[in-house]
């Protein structure tokens, strides 16, 4: 089970804390072009600021958050859940459950965001118009084996990967001959 956690302080501090407890975590990064002193450079920056994805059971996450709460002694919490605002808990309808992400969706997201390409961008559902909602798999190039929906973004055909409702990431341009229809098995 994968939980997404929102971190409040410095990303390296939160990641180090989770890893010190022996838990697996992932921070999605992006490669961005910047101009510094007239020179074009590629820098690494968080793709989704304040997000740290933790692969753990409910008990492990609860234990981690409890330890952080005890050690912070009333200071701002270093980590907290990111809550799923699309559903309510059955035992308490006024509260939202922590966001959990399916393993296959997380694997696909990690595969996409691990590629060193500055044209990978986070997007929202408002700017995407799926082309017939076609689900495809990329068959060639940097994004090979990434699957998602075809979309036209910034005037280019791209493949969009949805991690959870409202959290989408788009590849760089994908030519038509580098993708095929994806049939879920």
Question: What are the residue ranges of the model-derived segments?
Answer:
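Acidic-enriched and Gly/Ser
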Residues: 1-135, 160, 165-184
